[in-house]
């Protein structure tokens, strides 16, 4: 009885176990199919194919139910790895679906990223030298391209300067912000003026070519920042470009000697054209005569023209914005314009140096002072004069030497086209010989009664000198009338030529006293 009861009980237990196993398999398939449809990470739980269960010695409790055990949240979560509700234990299908999709995507991405990371880590070590080589090659190519662009820019700039030389006169050349050089076109320029023109806030500077007899000039306008905005060339160069803008001392001395020789030849040619001037002009011991080359100077003090300084005559009109209107008139204008409107041969300058305590030297002509300035290299001011005769182009400037304060340097330019005016209050005009007004040279005369000239040209009279005088011509060029002791003593001395002579002197009482003892 007891054995049969145990057999029945065991068979029932086996049936329950088989039923629970079959139910678990079906529920597993159902949950697996539903989870596959919801794209939840696949996890299959398989029941063992054969379970060897030994017959239990104790009868299971009636309160134990396999269905309750299978429906418990712990079993579902462990078997399907799906989160359940903490209160009811039921599956949350929507949340589980969304979370399953996201987790599936993340797991796939993580797997792919891990694969990519390992793969790229391995390949990066191999491809690193190639990348470095490419960078070096790119840098070298960039440097070569920059060098080529710089060479091309220099070539374009040189072509632009070469094209500038062939431009017509008075054509403006504009510059951008990167071409702010000081007009480096290969020629040597000298600045001779600067001023502010109307209608432009930029100052305008004036330059001329330093080559002898080259008429080329240019105007350069600069902005307030110092950038070149415009260059206007006037004229064309009649010489090739110099080889170097910086000459050595030997080449510079050779250049100046060549210029000096050319000026001497020019002066000899001008002197041969004017024989009357050469015959009537003589040098004196008290004067040092020299001629300056005037081929590269257009105005008074042009060589010492400083920036921002100018000399303007009060009676000259400013005919335009060009500084040529403020300069001296050319020889063609004074000679009636027979040169066809172009400057031909310029008169050389004549420099006279003498020693005097006063700056005003009486040379017989009348002058009017129109300017004064301090030039470079001499602390003493320079005064500018012009002849007061209407239509006379002669001008002069007077200054004291920098090495000797008593030495007065007078520079004349041009020649007078009129006679020497009569001295005020004297009959000088009636006693002088007529001269040809067409070729009257500049003859500086000494000051009457000046101490320097009296000591060098006169000596005290002695009785022996008077006894030895048996002719009408006394010593030192004095003409004396011995027959008439009471007549006036007339003295006349040609200082530098026949045109200038001393004024009449009053009778010398000492000489008249000595003449009274003559037989």
UniProtKB/Swiss-Prot annotation:
Transmembrane segments: none annotated. Residues 178-188, 323-332 have a biased composition (Basic and acidic residues). Residues 1-34, 123-212, 232-255, 267-349 are annotated as: Disordered. Residues 7-34, 164-174, 269-299 have a biased composition (Polar residues). Keywords: DNA-binding, Metal-binding, Nucleus, Phosphoprotein, Plant defense, Repeat, Stress response, Transcription, Transcription regulation, Zinc. One of its GO terms (cellular component) is nucleus. Induction: By salt stress. Induced by infection with the necrotrophic fungal pathogen B.cinerea. Induced by infection with the bacterial pathogen P.syringae pv. tomato DC3000. GO terms for molecular function: DNA-binding transcription factor activity; metal ion binding; transcription cis-regulatory region binding. Its main location: nucleus. InterPro entries: WRKY_dom, WRKY_dom_sf, WRKY_plant. GO terms for biological process: camalexin biosynthetic process; cellular heat acclimation; cellular response to heat; defense response to bacterium; defense response to fungus; positive regulation of autophagy; response to cold; response to heat. The keyword Zinc applies. Disruption phenotype: No visible phenotype under normal growth conditions, but mutant plants are extremely susceptible to the necrotrophic fungal pathogen B.cinerea. It is found in: Nucleus. Highly expressed in roots, leaves and flowers, and at lower levels in stems, siliques and seeds. Disulfide bonds: none annotated. Zn(2+) binds at residues 209, 214, 237, 239, 387, 392, 416, 418. Phosphorylated by MPK4. Phosphorylated on serine residues by MPK3 and MPK6 following infection with the necrotrophic fungal pathogen B.cinerea. Changing residue 362 to A: Loss of interaction with VQ10 protein. It holds the Pfam family WRKY. Residues 130-142, 245-254 have a biased composition (Low complexity). Interacts with MKS1. Interacts with ATG18A. Interacts with SIB1 and SIB2. Interacts with VQ1 and VQ10. Transcription factor. Interacts specifically with the W box (5'-TTGAC[CT]-3'), a frequently occurring elicitor-responsive cis-acting element. Involved in defense responses. Required for resistance to the necrotrophic fungal pathogen B.cinerea. Regulates the antagonistic relationship between defense pathways mediating responses to the bacterial pathogen P. syringae and the necrotrophic pathogen B.cinerea. Required for the phytoalexin camalexin synthesis following infection with B.cinerea. Belongs to the WRKY group I family. This is Probable WRKY transcription factor 33. It comes from Arabidopsis thaliana (Mouse-ear cress).
